[in-house]
From Swiss-Prot:
Similarity comment: family membership: Belongs to the RecA family. RAD51 subfamily.
Coiled-coil blocks: none
Protein's gene: RAD51C
Expressing tissues: Detected in various tissues. More expressed in reproductive tissues than in vegetative tissues, with the highest level in young flower buds.
Keyword ATP-binding: yes
Induction info: By genotoxic stress and by DNA damage.
Record-listed ATP binding positions: G130, V131, P132, G133, I134, G135, K136, T137
UniProt cross-references to PROSITE patterns, sorted A to Z: RECA_2 (PS50162)
Single GO molecular function: ATP binding
Protein name: DNA repair protein RAD51 homolog 3
Functional description taken from the UniProt entry: Involved in the homologous recombination repair (HRR) pathway of double-stranded DNA breaks arising during DNA replication or induced by DNA-damaging agents.
Key words of the record: ATP-binding, DNA damage, DNA recombination, DNA repair, DNA-binding, Nucleotide-binding, Nucleus
Length: 363
C-alpha cells in the first residue's frame, strides 16, 4: 500500500510560513554578533535553525560556543514567536492606509515635496546624495528647521538631531532659514486665521536653534559610539522627529582600510537607523557623497559606498545639475515612482526653481 502521508493543515502551514520569515535581528544578541549573522546572510530564523553550530560558526566568523547559543535562541523564538506573529499580522489595506497617513517633513520646495509624496516621510531611512555644492547640507539644515513647524501650521512640532561628520553645519545659515520659517508661519497664520493676530505664532528663531541637537563627530569610532547611544538619547527626548547625518560616508572613506569590515559596520549602522525610524516614528536622512566608478569603459559619478550600501536605505534621492539648475531625482523607493524636480537654494532656504535661478557659488 502506498502511503501519501497526512497533508499539513492550513494552520500548521501558516505557522511554518510565519516562523520562516521571523527576522534574525529580533534575537537578543550583541550588535557585533547580530551584524556578523546578517553579513553572512542569516537574516531569518529559519535559515539559522537549519544549520549546524559548526557551519554557523564558520560562516559568521564566530566561536562554536556562540553559534550554539544562537541556535538555542533561534529554536526558542521559532517555537514561542510564531503564534504572536500570526496574531499580529496586518492586512494590505491597513498597510496602505498607514503608508498614506505617515507624517512627512516639508522641504519648503513644493515641487520637491510633490515627487516625495508630501515631503520626507517618517519611519523611513532616506539617503540624499550628490556632488559638492549641490545643496545637501542646505537640505539637511532646512529639514532640521521645518520639522519644528507646529501642528497647527501643518508641521510635526518636533525636534532635530544633526550629526555633522564634515564640519559643514553653519549655525548662521541655520539662523537665516529659521528666521524665514518664522516669517512664513506668521504669514500662514494670518492668512488661514484672519480673526487671529498674525503674531500669535510664538516660536522665535532662537527657539528653533535650541531645538536642534548638534553633534560634531571627528572619527568613525565616535560615529559608531554616537549611533549606539542614539536610542537612549531619543528615549529621553521623545520630541525628536528627524535624525540627519551629514555625511554618513566621510570618515569611512577617509580612515577605513578594511573594506569587508567597513561593509559590516555600515550595515549594522543602517539597521540601527531603521530600528530608530520605526520605533520612534521619525525620519532618518543620510547625506552621502559621490565617487567615481568605472563602468562600460569610462568613469562615471556614483554615490559613495557602492551597490551593497544602496540596499540599506528605504528611499534614495540623487541631486544633480542640469545646466544652471539643481534637480532632485527619486532613484529608489518602494512606494514612490521615479521622478525628478528642480529646486533652488536661496537666502531663505530651499524654494521652487524659477526661470531666473542660476548656479550660485554660495556653498
Amino acid at each position: 500500500m502506498i502511503s501519501f502521508g497526512r497533508r499539513k493543515s492550513p494552520a500548521i502551514e501558516e505557522t511554518s510560513l510565519a516562523t520562516s520569515v521571523m527576522e534574525a535581528w529580533r534575537l537578543p544578541l550583541s550588535p557585533s554578533i547580530r551584524g556578523k549573522l546578517i553579513s553572512a546572510g542569516y537574516t531569518c530564523l529559519s535559515s539559522i535553525a537549519s544549520v549546524s553550530s559548526s557551519d554557523l560558526a564558520r560562516d559568521a566568523n564566530i566561536t562554536e560556543e556562540e553559534a550554539f547559543e544562537i541556535l538555542k535562541l533561534a529554536n526558542q523564538s521559532c517555537c514561542n514567536g510564531s503564534r504572536s506573529l500570526i496574531n499580529g499580522a496586518k492586512n494590505a489595506w491597513d498597510m496602505l492606509h498607514e503608508e498614506e497617513s505617515l507624517p512627512r517633513i516639508t522641504t519648503s520646495c513644493s515641487d520637491l515635496d510633490n515627487i516625495l509624496g508630501g515631503g520626507i516621510s517618517c519611519r523611513d531611512v532616506t539617503e540624499i546624495g550628490g556632488v559638492p555644492g549641490i545643496g545637501k547640507t542646505q537640505i539637511g539644515i532646512q529639514l532640521s528647521v521645518n520639522v519644528q513647524i507646529p501642528r497647527e501650521c501643518g508641521g510635526l512640532g518636533g525636534k532635530a538631531i544633526y550629526i555633522d561628520t564634515e564640519g559643514s553645519f553653519m549655525v548662521e545659515r541655520a539662523l537665516q532659514i529659521a528666521e524665514a520659517c518664522v516669517e512664513d508661519m506668521e504669514e500662514y497664520t494670518g492668512y488661514m486665521h484672519k480673526h487671529f493676530q498674525a503674531n500669535q505664532v510664538q516660536m522665535k528663531p532662537e527657539d528653533i536653534l535650541e531645538n536642534i541637537f548638534y553633534f560634531r563627530v571627528c572619527s568613525y569610532t565616535e560615529q559608531i559610539a554616537l549611533v549606539n547611544h542614539l536610542e537612549k538619547f531619543i528615549s529621553e527626548n521623545k520630541d525628536v522627529k528627524v535624525v540627519i547625518v551629514d555625511s554618513i560616508t566621510f570618515h569611512f572613506r577617509q580612515d577605513y582600510d578594511d573594506l569587508a569590515q567597513r561593509t559590516r559596520v555600515l550595515s549594522e549602522m543602517a539597521l540601527k537607523f531603521m530600528k530608530l525610524a520605526k520605533k520612534f516614528s521619525l525620519a532618518v536622512v543620510l547625506l552621502n557623497q559621490v565617487t567615481t566608478k568605472f563602468s562600460e569603459g569610462s568613469f562615471q559619478l556614483a554615490l559613495a559606498l557602492g551597490d551593497s550600501w544602496s540596499h540599506s536605505c528605504t528611499n534614495r534621492v540623487i541631486l544633480y545639475w542640469n545646466g544652471d539648475e539643481r534637480y532632485a531625482y527619486i532613484d529608489k523607493s518602494p512606494s514612490l515612482p521615479s521622478a525628478s524636480a528642480s529646486y533652488t537654494v536661496t537666502s531663505r532656504g530651499l524654494r521652487n526653481s524659477s526661470s531666473s535661478s542660476k548656479r550660485v557659488k554660495m556653498m
